[in-house]
A protein has these predicted regions:
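Helix-biased detector of long, well-ordered alpha-helical tracts
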Residues: 1-224
Length: 224
């Protein structure tokens, strides 16, 4: 995609320079987003853990959801996958498929959401791609993490007789979506806000995942 295709400096390279390059400023492996790929050197004694989730407007989020919330949710559901493997996050790659009529302030809000959460979780952008499309708005993110070699939490270690433990409350996110759609009535205002927040912003349990490494026989993420 060229600048001429989208006009007004909102083409791929202009958007990368203005909105995405700053997200990679503190990530040496990203090489300033000036090359075709990132160069990542694994920490000695660590295994790399890769996770990818995609989100599509009207399927995984509402079309009127704030772009900041969409970006943060996209990052967090991937970080939750890393947490389920006992991994610490290192960075991420993001691919964005933007409808041709998507306003530039939506994209700016999306980048702002990524910036807010990458700062919160101490990571940075490694690379990605942007494409203009007839629609729908689609987003894909790959999270990269590390875990002590051979210590990744797997699903296949579960066995009959194991104690099953759940962190958090199952169903809060789904209830939050129903609340946003007006499908729940009579809810306390504070509870409704809490449920909607859980829908928008799942909490990656990175510290818990790390704590469970070497202790739990199996683990799975159910945040999304």
């Amino acid at each position: 995609m060229t600048d001429a295709e989208t006009g007004n400096g909102n083409g791929e390279f202009a958007l990368i320079d203005r909105l995405l390059k700053p997200l990679a400023a503190n990530t040496p492996a990203a090489l300033g987003l000036t090359d075709d790929a990132a160069v990542l050197s694994p920490t000695p004694g660590k295994d790399l853990i890769l996770a990818k989730d995609a989100m599509v407007a009207g399927v995984h989020f509402l079309e009127d959801d704030a772009p900041e919330d969409v970006a943060r949710k996209l990052l967090r559901v991937n970080l939750s996958d890393l947490a389920a493997m006992g991994a610490a996050p290192v960075g991420y790659l993001v691919a964005s498929f933007w409808p041709e009529k998507l306003p530039s302030n939506w994209i700016e809000g999306f980048a702002a959401g990524l910036e807010k959460d990458q700062n919160e979780f101490g990571i940075g952008l490694l690379g990605g791609d942007t494409v203009r499309t007839p629609g729908p708005l689609s987003l894909s993110l790959t999270a990269v993490g590390e875990v002590t070699a051979g210590q990744a939490l797997r699903r296949n270690g579960a066995a009959e007789g194991d104690l099953i433990v759940v962190s958090g409350t199952i169903g809060d996110g789904a209830l939050g979506l129903l609340a946003l759609k007006g499908a729940l009535v009579g809810l306390d205002e504070d509870l409704q806000k809490k449920l909607i927040d859980r829908y928008h912003l799942p909490q990656p349990r990175l510290a818990l995942g790390k704590l469970l490494t070497g202790k739990a026989t199996a683990c799975i993420d159910i945040s999304d």
